[in-house]
Amino acid sequence: MSRLSVLTEAIFQDKHNVMIAGIAGSGKSYLLRQLYDESVKRGIVSILTSTTGVSSFNIGCSTIHSFTGIILPTQMPKDPEEFVSRIVTRIKFKRYLLKKWQNLKILFIDEVSMLGANYIDVVNEVAKRVRGSSSPFGGIQVIASGDFLQLPPVNDSFCFESPCWEELRFKNYVLTKAYRFTEQKWNDILQRARVGKLTKEDMEVLKGCVNKKNNSDIQPTVIYSLRRDVDDLNEVALDDLSSEFITFIAEDTLGEEEKTGSVNIIRHCSEEQSKVLDSTLNIGRKIKLKVGAQVMLVANLDVAMGLVNGSRGVITKVEADNVIVKFKGKEYEFEHPISPYAFKIEHQGEYYVRTIVPLIPAYASTVHKMQGLTIDCGIINCGSSIFSPGQAYVALSRVRSLDGLFLEQISQSKIYPNKLALNFEEKMRKKAVFIDREINDEEV
């Protein structure tokens, strides 16, 4: 049986809550999207969400924060009961929100590993009260995917530490094959890096990538741990180019979905609505670039050509509304015009659309921003730059191949997992079903 067949039976026939785990590049997000599409075909009221903007864009969904309308403060309120009551009152006051919660049958959550325990507890309690049911999530079936050995939640503990996780009694499935990486040696190294068990031979291969020469006009993206380092490098690199700055301003609009699936634009966004787009998308309202700038494509334009989210290139010229970019293909470099692109998200019953050239400076990016992305080539410091578990693994697993990997430093002691997450995974795997099938590279 295929992955889809196995999970279709578990979800739609046996009605299990399901957790889909697996290594980076194993197709978790793609499979979750397939399962959501299957639920829609069956006429089941479902919502597909993710915990991050990058992932939500990749699989075409809203963030879970956008769906629930729940944003936790940096620190949990002193009176959680009063906080939950306020949220429930707000939902009951707005008919469309109440109807959305009450009619929902299945909630799909991608990148669940970045969902915190406090957050899932609050959502669980809100769902129970709004739906008038003491069942976990008020009786909503939960289908989640993620890798707890990647990055943890920000300012929160893991969701599996929440009492709610035990209540949900997930049926666990593990995807064991990585399809993002076509090179077996690289795939094997990453699987061992994930659990902190690199061999002497692995380290020799990685050391061979330290100070490696790049023979392409397309410079590798530098992956940093800290945002300030990213901003500094992107700014300095652009300033060093002798060409003039070209500024692109986004058009933010509201729309409604037509029967054809297209979005009919109604009006321009307010400032608050534009802020929703800011927090969800991996692209801002204003982009400053130059001819000669290293850029990253942040939209899936043409999979067959290799023009996908994460593709790297360099701007060669600008013609009217088009930016001409030289991209790094699988076998050769090629130029292609990039036009303004409409990024769409669904938020509280409306479609928010940001139209702008889908390119960002790619001299540097943070590890956090890179989770969920794949790039052709990257420079990584797996030494002094790493300060938390899972960081090195996430950074390394963003790069498609050993050929595209360039290291500043490599220290085996910096490539280690979160012990709590590792213990959880080991326990989960003892009760899990391991599934796999052959799929095309484009599907992952």
Model-derived segments and spans:
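Conserved ATP-binding/catalytic motifs of P-loop helicase motor domains
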Residues: 1-444
